[in-house]
Every structure is written in structure tokens, then in C-alpha cells.
Amino acid sequence: MIKTTKMLAAILVCSTTPVLADGHSQIWSMAGLANAPSSSKMMEGMTGSILINSSIDLWDWSEAPEGFPTLVTAECNQSIALTAEGAPFGGVGVCSMMDPDGDLAIYFGEITPQLEYIGSLTAGSGKYEPYVGQKFVGTVTGMLKTGQQMYHVVAAD
């Protein structure tokens, strides 16, 4: 159970991209596949641990508007704080991606004790630049024993 909880928290990083709809900035829903971590490190202390993971995630942007790619990959890195018993109680994650047009986006977020990922677009170029600061919430919808997961992301506002 502790291993599953650690993996769930560690791979929860997810993202989405903002768009214009009806004159207002909005974020479309997306699905993501977090691969098993390509690297993993545990820093163990007296009262808890920090799990540091990296993975390459696949993002399904099939609901994206015209001009945005419908499928992208992102490099994601997470640091998850765990109690001495192995339960997550917070963390951070960063996902960086460059789309086929060469536009880039960096997403940052906090991983909550409820295993949600609350984040925003922190930096972006090209079509992403006008939407820096857009917020989203991600939740895991399924996980395999290998650490691979499906997650879903929606607008936070």
C-alpha cells in the first residue's frame, strides 16, 4: 500500500493548456499517461522522506482548438514529502514540453495530501505565452502496478 501511495503521489504531475472561448481564457480538459519513472530517488530522514521522480508523460489534447497539437509529450519531475509511515503530505512538480511548432510551456504545481495536483502554466512561448498563470487541477483516474497512470485535468476556475 505504501509503495502504491508513493507512486500515485509521485506521478500525479499533469497539465493542460489554455485557450480562448467566448472571449474568455479557458482551459480544455485533457487526459495524460504517466509512464513508470525513468529515475527515482528517496531521501530518507528521521521523521519522513522525500521521493524524487522523473518521467516522460504523454498528453492527449484531442479537445484542443485548431492550431494546438492533439498529442504531446512532457518531461515531468516531482518531489513528494512522505510521513514516516509513507503517506504523502505535500509536494511539487514541474512538467516541461515543446510542441511540434517549437513553442514551449512549463507547468508548475503543488501535490496535495488528497493526491490532487493544483497548478498553473508558469512560462510559455508562442501560442502559450498569453496564457501564463492559467490554473488547473489534475486527478489520477487509474494506475498499474508498474507505476504507469492515467490522469485527467480540468480548469481550476
How would you label these PLM feature ranges?
Residues 2-10:
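Sec-dependent signal peptide recognition
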Residues 16-18:
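N-terminal signal peptide c-region/cleavage motif recognized by signal peptidases
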Residues 22-157:
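Beta-strand-enriched cores of mature, soluble protein domains
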